[in-house]
Amino acid sequence: MSKTFAEIAEAFLEPEAVRIAKEAVEEYGDHERKIIQIGIHFQVCCMFCDEYLSTNGSDRFVLIEGRKRGTAVSLQNELCKSYDLEPLPFLCDIFDREEKQFVEIGITRKADDSYFQSKFGKLGNSCKIFVFSYDGRLDKNCEGPMEEQKLRIFSFLATAADFLRKENMFNEIFLPDNEETIIEMKKGKTFLKLRDESVPLPFQTYEQMKDYCEKFKGNPRELASKVSQMQSNIKLPIKHYEQNKFRQIRLPKGPMAPYTHKFLMEEAWMFTKISDPERSRAGEILIDFFKKGNLSAIRPKDKPLQGKYPIHYKNLWNQIKAAIADRTMVINENDHSEFLGGIGRASKKIPEVSLTQDVITTEGLKQSENKLPEPRSFPKWFNAEWMWAIKDSDLTGWVPMAEYPPADNELEDYAEHLNKTMEGVLQGTNCAREMGKCILTVGALMTECRLFPGKIKVVPIYARSKERKSMQEGLPVPSEMDCLFGICVKSKSHLNKDDGMYTIITFEFSIREPNLEKHQKYTVFEAGHTTVRMKKGESVIGREVPLYLYCRTTALSKIKNDWLSKARRCFITTMDTVETICLRESAKAEENLVEKTLNEKQMWIGKKNGELIAQPLREALRVQLVQQFYFCIYNDSQLEGFCNEQKKILMALEGDKKNKSSFGFNPEGLLEKIEECLINNPMCLFMAQRLNELVIEASKRGAKFFKID
């Protein structure tokens, strides 16, 4: 046990809190620094409970935190049984006898409500949540706590923070959010024995194989003889690409591929309001928009501009407004919601026949043949939307990111400066706007799926951002904005398997008329007018434009939920790629070359008017981010197959650049495999077209392995 952490804890915490913290660290094998965190949390829970009585004179609160896990689980189950409550799948800190509800206490040093949002995403409204911060902020999902409780807790947290800062331990006791506790592992005899047994023949031990691999040096003649020996055993002849050149990929012909992403992007229109930290839940945001923005006045016209089932969509929109007005966010089952939600419409594969009926023929048991999707041509709208995603939006700060941990050396200072620079470029893009929309909206859908699988729920399609003006003026706290893009209805969602699907019906706002080729899957209504702010010289004027309501029925799966709710990974991957390049240049020169590398190092990003376009890394970041995000939203079996096969052509291109010989068994078969993946995925068709352009450019520069049709 570290004396440093224990002594500091004993200096300002109650002895009982220190004892509980030490036992918890020993029980769960946590790092010693957790003594202080656990002790503070336990003492706050005690302050929340102490000296408060119910109307009958008994203790109002039951403290669950601080007990052994087995005892705590038994106590919680006993309370659920005594008060006729559903058992919870997680342990809470406190039980309120008067309210008959469990309470979860959280403590954070973050200045925003991200910790509260993460807790609320896991727990929902199944219990009360109170998150106290060291700077006096309180986030909660219900009324309370009492004023006396708040004052006692905030006073204690301020005292604890001051004491820890004097000891230079305030940052030390907190690990960064993305860093796990380090657990030292030792290799036991059983592990070493299993490791030696798993090595391939002819090796006997792991150390023998490791020694061979470290000393191995390739012999070209020996490798060539092995290749010729393998060739004699394989029926397919090896073909060198100098004589058997790659042709261009044949793109499918037919109607243009439609828009398939779950939410509108370029055409989406948003209503904005100043964010209220006290009302940050999805349902509260939606109620505030309808109350303050008078969105209940949006009424779709009887006749749609395009699409099917207009009566069902209109009636469901009226039910949505009623659910928001009565604040339940629940839509009762009826013909319209069941039809659009697909409830009771699952087709039976084989008809059920009772024993009393006649035996049916073999023909009657045959299932109908699966219809393959219709091949679609490359969509012209895709390039325009790609360029739109690269450009800046009116707001910034769309993607919630973790705080930067304190830097320990000079290289980490470079990395922190670089990441802040890149984040400043990327956070204001339209692509970041769509990422933020996916993270919050799909995160809210996941919570509703988990907590209310049998109900039809209303969820906002929304995001959070910050004003550019506030950021540029250097104000201490930029104005946070809530942005509403539309409303989503979640149908029943009993997701028992990872590939389980559930239906969503989206109603999205737009000020653009629909493109019949792009928006084939949408039913579009005129729904009134809205005011758009436009710049005219130095002044800003308002112009009234038509408002359209884009309606669509689609589906999400558990896997797709996970992909879209964690879209910020695209952000991290993009920044990591550029960070590696910049830090490598700085390490080579042994000086800070971050800004120089960002501004001077070029990257090819595409083609315009027959010429390749290169941009500095600082701007090429945008293209990298859009590509990563589009992989996330358009990912399917077509895209996976295409990316897997196109790598072989890119490897041949790299070999050509290095003047090396390349060969394979069936170059024409490789191209046919790629073409099998080109059906109707817009991203696949876009990448195939880019690959053809790359082949043309390589051939112009003297590539030997490619031919132009």
Swiss-Prot record:
Binds 2 manganese ions per subunit. InterPro entries: INFV_PA, PA/PA-X, PA/PA-X_sf. Influenza RNA polymerase is composed of three subunits: PB1, PB2 and PA. Interacts (via C-terminus) with PB1 (via N-terminus). A motif (Nuclear localization signal 1 (NLS1)) lies at residues 109-124. The gene is PA. It comes from Influenza C virus (strain C/Ann Arbor/1/1950). Belongs to the influenza viruses PA family. Plays an essential role in viral RNA transcription and replication by forming the heterotrimeric polymerase complex together with PB1 and PB2 subunits. The complex transcribes viral mRNAs by using a unique mechanism called cap-snatching. It consists in the hijacking and cleavage of host capped pre-mRNAs. These short capped RNAs are then used as primers for viral mRNAs. The PB2 subunit is responsible for the binding of the 5' cap of cellular pre-mRNAs which are subsequently cleaved after 10-13 nucleotides by the PA subunit that carries the endonuclease activity. Its EC number is 3.1.-.-. Mn(2+) 1 binds at H41, D93, E104, I105. This is Polymerase acidic protein. GO terms for cellular component: host cell cytoplasm; host cell nucleus. Keywords: Cap snatching, Endonuclease, Eukaryotic host gene expression shutoff by virus, Eukaryotic host transcription shutoff by virus, Host cytoplasm, Host gene expression shutoff by virus, Host nucleus, Host-virus interaction, Hydrolase, Inhibition of host RNA polymerase II by virus, Manganese, Metal-binding, Nuclease, Phosphoprotein. Mn(2+) 2 binds at E65, D93.
